[in-house]
Amino acid sequence: MGSGAHAVKLEGVDGHEDVIRHIVGSGVPVMGHIGLTPQSVHQLGGFRVQGKTGEQADHLVRQARVLEDLGCFAVVVECVPATVGARITEAVSIPTIGIGAGPATDGQVLVLSDLLGIESRVPRFARRYMDGASLVTDALNQYAADVKDARFPTCAESYS
C-alpha cells in the first residue's frame, strides 16, 4: 500500500459490513476489532467489560464470524470475559488477538503505556512490566535541571 501500511484495523461490525467488504475487495487486508471498541467507548457506556450476558456473548461470536466471512485476516477481541474470548477463538478459523480477553485467544496485545507503567491507572487486564512513570519523571527532572544549570545543551549536542 502506498503509505507503507500493510493492513488496517477497523472497530465494530454492525452496519459496516459493506464498508469492510469493499475495503477487503479492494485488496487491503483488514483486521477486525470487537468487544470494547475504544473509538466508540462513549456509545458503549465507558470502558466496561463487554459480552457479560449470554445474549451479548452470542452477539460477539456472531460478529467474529461475520468478520471472518467478510474476509478479515484476524480479529482483535477486547475487554470480554475469558470464557467469551475462548468461545470466539473456537468459533472462527482466523487468528484472535486478545486484549483483556483471557488466555485462550491465539495472540495477545497490550497498550505500550500500560505495559511500561507510564499511566497511573492500569486496566485490570494489563500487567506492568516496569515502573515507567517514575523513570519518565526522573528523566524529565534531570533534563529540567540540566537546562536550568546550563549543562544542556553542550557543544556535543550542537551543530557546527
Where are these regions (language model features)?
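Alpha/beta enzyme core
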Residues: 1-130, 134-160
